[in-house]
Amino acid sequence: MAKPTTLYDKIWNDHLVDEQPDGTCLLYIDRHLVHEVTSPQAFEGLRVAGRKVHAPEKTLAVVDHNVPTTDRSKPNPDPESAEQIAALATNARDFGVQYFNEFDKRQGIVHVIGPEQGFTLPGTTIVCGDSHTSTHGAFGALAHGIGTSEVEHVLATQTLIQKKAKNMRAVVDGKLPDGVTAKDIILAIIGEIGTAGGTGYVLEYAGEAIRALTMEGRMTICNMSIEGGARAGLVAPDEKAYEFLKGRPLTPKGANWEQAVRYWDTLRSDDNAHFDHEIRLDAANLPPIVTWGTSPEDVVSVAGFVPDPAKIEDEAKRLSKERALAYMGLNAGTKITDIKLDRVFIGSCTNGRIEDLRAAAKVINGHTVNGHVNAMVVPGSGLVKEQAEAEGLDKIFIKAGFEWREPGCSMCLAMNPDKLAPEERCASTSNRNFEGRQGFKGRTHLVSPAMAAAAAIAGHFVDIRDWKAA
């Protein structure tokens, strides 16, 4: 009888080309996504060596990190960013890779456009020179970020050298309360295991609450696997995944689709498969979450208080949290709902999809952004923007006082014109709250789209559960 295997084991075994005695493996890569920041050196390496891209049809290129989200008819204000964008256009043309430029309505954040185009498929291996490649694991794909030298290796060989990770599972059972979302689930998991808790593992998400999520919700969860230290995140594919993908430009068609679904139906962990580590959460007990510090593990209920580092026994950890409090300009014991905000950012590869914009618009409709808050909505792709405008969401945001922007990574990271000023405080639907992540000395609090929307109106954090009841 065959040994029970996990979903990760199955995908790994299906793509294993070679394994050396020391555990070093050569893995076949099905899909490769590239953007303007981590690809220029890789393409130049190919050019210098006189190599071609091995399988150009398996690579998709898009600009996202550096593109301005305002008027794109004007020159990029940052010369280095403009150079990187121009380099990607040249490299895509020279090496025969499909490319979505900043004027293409299919352009957007790389981890939004992959599933949107049907480039992301269950059971595939997917890499990108970007840490949030784990997003694609929502479809049952083994997806993770790689370095620039590895980008060159994949372009040249369609393979990757690596060692197999261990198996970890997060089981989230129960039903989410009103106002609690996928973003709160993943922040709760990271709060439970810490930012190093998943190190050395591929993390599969399972349980009633995960199965109940939409594909957008599953993408939010898998997106932040890296914030929990995991190499990748996975959710077993099901009818929701198939429905999302069917008919998209790059998915199989006709008999090929039916054949693919038959294979995808085998992609789930066996009942008695071994996991090296497992955690369990009850969704019914989860609150809306806000991060208070400079690490995604610094989580607290919106109904709670800024914690006191003095109560931490471990000296190194205590000093780290004291530094975080000082950087964030907060005092221990402060009510989370008393924290006032300067900026609100709704977007990113974590929460920039149509479902996220609908959730935010539902809260905002009929209200006005607080006078001391600057708020912006940045759709995750041109197609998300187009759909939102077809539904009239842009009008809701604009009427309320939000800026309605062009697609891109935007204020998730300080690599384009959308940045926080020093000591500005932002409620953000993105994935990282590190020091300087959104701008020099900027202060970031991670929240769900609905929480961000309510905070924009109130000017401070509010418990979305009370908001809905109001």
UniProtKB/Swiss-Prot annotation:
Q: Which organism is it from?
A: Afipia carboxidovorans (strain ATCC 49405 / DSM 1227 / KCTC 32145 / OM5) (Oligotropha carboxidovorans)
Swiss-Prot/TrEMBL GO biological process terms:
L-leucine biosynthetic process
Cofactor(s) needed: [4Fe-4S] cluster
User: Which of this chain's residues are annotated to bind [4Fe-4S] cluster?
Assistant: C349, C409, C412
Q: Which reaction does it catalyse?
A: (2R,3S)-3-isopropylmalate = (2S)-2-isopropylmalate
E.C. numbers? 4.2.1.33
Tell me, what does this protein do in biology?
A: Catalyzes the isomerization between 2-isopropylmalate and 3-isopropylmalate, via the formation of 2-isopropylmaleate.
Alphabetically ordered keywords of this record: 4Fe-4S, Amino-acid biosynthesis, Branched-chain amino acid biosynthesis, Iron, Iron-sulfur, Leucine biosynthesis, Lyase, Metal-binding
Q: What is this protein called?
A: 3-isopropylmalate dehydratase large subunit
Query: Subunit comment for this entry?
Result: Heterodimer of LeuC and LeuD.
What molecular function does GO assign, one term? 3-isopropylmalate dehydratase activity
Quote the PANTHER family the UniProt record gives: 3-ISOPROPYLMALATE DEHYDRATASE, HOMOACONITASE, MITOCHONDRIAL-RELATED
Which protein family is named in the record? Belongs to the aconitase/IPM isomerase family. LeuC type 1 subfamily.
Tell me the pathway.
Answer: Amino-acid biosynthesis; L-leucine biosynthesis; L-leucine from 3-methyl-2-oxobutanoate: step 2/4
